[in-house]
Amino acid sequence: MSDIIKRDLEATRNALLNSTAKLMTDCSEPSEVTSRAIAKESGVNLAMINYCFGSREGLLYEVFRKLLSDVQKHDTEFIKIMSSGMSPKQKLTELHFKMMRLMIANYNYSQAVTKYILFNRNDDFGMESLPFIVEHFNGRKNIEDCRLIAFELTSIHELSVLRYETIKSSCNIDLTDDETLKWYICQNINRFLD
């Protein structure tokens, strides 16, 4: 592939990412951010969404992943925690706390990408918890068991974000309250890691 084609493809990817982020920020419902709306906003051929990202959902996930990555890079407190001497279990708690808080604060993104994440998660995708779980068990569980725990724990938390209003009304657990959210995460992590 020539350098010109690579630059054009990268420019197309960036236009799609930036336009999608803008549309997601401005919309009241994620369903408003259609492939056609994204293509129109970015000035890019509709087929390029599938070519660059595999699907609209893949594009939405990339936008969300970039948002999460930007928050993690610029949140000095989070960076300090992740590089501290905290136990893997404590770091896992902080990771899930940050992730769930971000997902609740950006609920439109969460609604749009959670199903995609749940159905496409694999060893390279959506398994940010795995290293902390492996380190926590330190050989007491095999890698397959650790992957299963990472999958189950992350899936529970992602589904909890989607249903946070129902959890509040049915169980009187307000996941928008930081203290309650931290408690909820600790309860779930303890179930899987103890």
Language-model features and meaning:
Residues M1-A11:
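N-terminal intrinsically disordered/low-complexity leader segments
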Residues L9, R13-A21:
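Short, leucine-enriched amphipathic alpha-helices that occur as contiguous helical runs
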Residues R101, A112-K115, A150-I173, R191-D194:
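Amphipathic C-terminal alpha-helical segment
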Residues A15, L23-G58, E62:
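Helix-turn-helix
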Residues Q72-T76, T114-L148, W183:
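Amphipathic alpha-helical packing segments from all-alpha helical-bundle domains
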Residues S35, R65-Q72, F78:
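Short, basic, alpha-helical segments at the C-terminal edge of helix-turn-helix-like DNA-binding modules
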Residues T76-Y109, I143, A150:
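Hydrophobic alpha-helical connector segments
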Residues V134-I143, L162-D194:
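C-terminal peripheral helix-coil segments that are non-catalytic and often amphipathic
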